Curated annotation (Swiss-Prot):
Involved in the heme biosynthesis. Catalyzes the aerobic oxidative decarboxylation of propionate groups of rings A and B of coproporphyrinogen-III to yield the vinyl groups in protoporphyrinogen-IX. The gene is hemF. One of its GO terms (molecular function) is coproporphyrinogen oxidase activity. It catalyses: coproporphyrinogen III + O2 + 2 H(+) = protoporphyrinogen IX + 2 CO2 + 2 H2O. The active site is at H108 (proton donor). Pathway: Porphyrin-containing compound metabolism; protoporphyrin-IX biosynthesis; protoporphyrinogen-IX from coproporphyrinogen-III (O2 route): step 1/1. A divalent metal cation binds at H98, H108, H147, H177. This is Oxygen-dependent coproporphyrinogen-III oxidase. Homodimer. Belongs to the aerobic coproporphyrinogen-III oxidase family. PROSITE patterns: COPROGEN_OXIDASE. Keywords: Cytoplasm, Heme biosynthesis, Metal-binding, Oxidoreductase, Porphyrin biosynthesis.
């Protein structure tokens, strides 16, 4: 179990993604290297990269973190109660890109490795991650491209993984109180160890490496599309759903805050502008209504 190899991969992935996104945007990611004091309950370090006010990205963050703690927080043991009381080591890259143009979808990607340790037992490790797309104005060809790229990343590791991880994503990124999906999904996995460490790590790398091919062509095609105040207002309204999900349901956000993580890095996933309108409904037959009827309901995109 070579966690240093995982760390090296994650740092390189962060470099590659920020380089490509910066080239398309024309702006520069600011790097904020941080380290937790050894006296705090959560120890470790990380490297947050953020671009705000760009031509493409109104706000985009790509964070790397490598942290350790003496006791797993409740969010990490909810599905694994046998691990309660163990110490842990966690490392990962997480990103959220909130584009300025409403025709470019918001995108989220995360890959991570987790090790739960106890002095009198063997370490328990697993990988997690995935990526998902949140359009404001949907295009079938974009959704199909994104899902086909996810499917291709998983294909070498078993044909059953894509439909399994897609369903997991559809179930996970769902706002129960709204009875609607956050977006058009993608793939999501957690507690994954079934291929052995090396092969599971390879699968995680394949997912991480698929992010740029999945999202960048969509951004390149849509970022120059003309838009007005109507589209920006709808984008801000739908971003409100993103805020609701991240603060109420997201396991990564809850884990970070419960374990004493760095709030600025954890909350970089928040959109720069969002709003709420009481009982707002889209005009029937409008492009905004099409998001609800044609894109948010779970469906097969490949």
């Amino acid at each position: 179990m070579d966690t240093q190899a995982v760390r090296a991969y994650l740092l390189d992935l962060q470099d590659r993604i920020t380089t490509a996104a910066s080239a398309l945007d024309g702006g520069t990611f600011v790097t904020d290297a941080w380290e937790k004091p050894p006296t705090e309950r959560l120890r470790g370090s990380g490297r947050t990269r953020i671009l705000e006010g760009g031509a493409l990205l109104e706000r985009g963050g790509v964070g790397f973190s490598h942290v350790m703690g003496d006791t797993l927080p409740p969010s990490a043991t909810a599905n694994r109660p046998e691990l309660a009381g163990r110490g842990f080591e966690a490392m990962g890259v997480s990103l959220v890109f909130h584009p300025r143009n409403p025709y470019v979808p918001t995108v989220h990607m995360n890959v991570r490795c987790f090790v739960a340790v106890r002095s009198d037992a063997a370490p328990v490790w697993w990988f997690g991650g995935g990526m998902d797309l949140t359009p404001y104005y949907g295009f079938t060809e974009d959704a199909s491209h994104f899902h086909r790229t996810c499917q291709g990343a998983l294909a070498p590791y078993g044909d059953e993984l894509y439909p399994r991880f897609k369903q997991w994503c559809d179930d996970y990124f769902y706002l129960k109180h709204r009875k609607e999906a956050r977006g058009i999904g993608g793939i999501f996995f957690d507690d994954f160890a079934e291929l052995g460490f090396e092969r599971s790590f390879e699968m995680m790398r394949s997912v991480g490496d698929a992010f740029l091919p999945a999202w960048l062509p969509i951004a390149e095609q849509r970022h120059a599309t003309a838009y007005g105040e109507r589209e920006r207002a709808f984008q801000a309204y739908r971003r409100g759903r993103y805020v609701e999900f991240n603060l109420v349901f997201d396991r990564g956000t809850l884990f970070g805050l419960q374990s004493g993580g760095r709030a600025e890095s954890i909350l970089m996933s928040m959109p720069p502008v969002a709003n709420w309108r009481y009982d707002w409904q889209p005009e029937p037959g409008s492009p905004e209504a099409a998001l609800y009827t044609d894109f948010l309901p779970a469906r097969d995109w490949v």
